[in-house]
Every structure is written in structure tokens, then in C-alpha cells.
């Protein structure tokens, strides 16, 4: 990654995204950026390259018929092979929502958590809700102020006399 420095940022929006699972449980998902770094590198478009640390959060609200006796010990592994699992279909409820962060250098980072898979385990959380394992990814978009762009110098190529 080269050299990188932490950069201050302001969280403008960090929404919970709601999903309805096929078993009638409601899943809430949220991504939080905890630190942003600006590197000394630039992408092919001349934009500074940023990196960040983030944490995903998931919580559920299950109907009574899905609840069970809390597992002892409480489930902690996120490895599906540690449990008997059932894939659960799901769909997002409401409109697409992006997290929005304004960096001190006026760059705007937009990032969206996207749930890509859900499995229900044979275990129950401390509140009696089924224990789910959620797979997810993040989509990002950056809007960099023009004054931060690095001018690209065209690479010289050997001149060929194509008009002979």
C-alpha cells in the first residue's frame, strides 16, 4: 500500500439496512467505518488511493415461533461448518441506502453493505433468536475534489513513421 496516513472524517449517514428473511425473521445490517487512511499512491485516473478499517454489525428480530432456548455455551463461531445450517432466502426492505463519509480533504466516501447470503444454524443466541451467519460485501464510490487529482503525464511511446 505504500505510505499511508490517517485522515479525519465525519459520518454523514450510517443507516441500518433492513432485510426480511424467508422464515419471517427481520435482519438488520450496518457497516461502520472506524478509520480512513490516505495513501501516497494514485489510481490510473489520478485520484488519491484511500484505505479504511470497518466493522459490520448484524442483529435480528425473530417472531415467537422462531425463538428457542438460548444455546449453552452461546454460539460464537462464524464458520458454517461448525453447525448444522439451512440456507435462508432474503430480500431487502426499503430503498437502497449508502453510508456517506466526508473526509477532511473534502473527498466523499460512499460505501454500501450488501448482504449476499444468510444461513440459519441449529443454535440460538442469548435472546432466543435463531443464530444466523451472514455473508456480505461492500460497494464503494469516491468523489474526489478536482484539486486533489494528480495530473497524468502521457507516457512517451516511440514514434513510428506510419506515413512512409
Predicted segment positions?
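Aromatic- and glycine-enriched beta-alpha-beta binding-site module
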Residues: 30-38
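A structural feature that tracks compact, well-ordered secondary-structure segments
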Residues: 31-32, 111-116
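Short, charged/polar N-terminal "headpieces" of proteins
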Residues: 1-22
Amino acid at each position: 500500500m505504500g505510505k499511508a496516513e490517517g485522515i479525519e472524517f465525519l459520518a454523514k449517514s450510517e443507516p441500518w439496512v433492513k432485510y426480511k428473511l424467508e422464515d419471517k425473521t427481520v435482519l438488520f445490517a450496518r457497516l461502520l467505518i472506524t478509520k480512513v487512511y490516505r495513501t501516497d499512491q494514485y489510481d490510473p485516473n489520478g485520484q488519491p488511493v484511500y484505505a479504511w478499517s470497518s466493522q459490520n454489525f448484524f442483529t435480528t428480530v425473530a417472531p415467537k415461533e422462531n425463538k428457542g432456548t438460548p444455546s449453552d455455551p452461546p454460539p460464537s463461531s462464524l464458520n458454517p461448518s461448525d453447525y448444522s445450517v439451512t440456507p435462508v432466502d432474503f430480500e431487502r426492505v426499503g430503498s437502497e441506502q449508502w453510508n456517506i463519509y466526508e473526509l477532511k480533504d473534502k473527498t466523499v466516501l460512499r460505501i454500501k453493505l450488501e448482504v449476499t447470503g444468510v444461513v440459519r444454524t441449529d443454535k440460538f443466541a442469548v435472546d432466543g433468536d435463531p443464530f444466523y451467519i451472514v455473508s456480505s460485501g461492500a460497494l464503494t464510490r469516491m468523489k474526489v475534489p478536482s484539486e486533489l487529482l494528480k495530473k497524468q503525464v502521457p507516457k512517451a511511446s516511440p514514434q513510428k513513421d506510419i506515413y512512409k
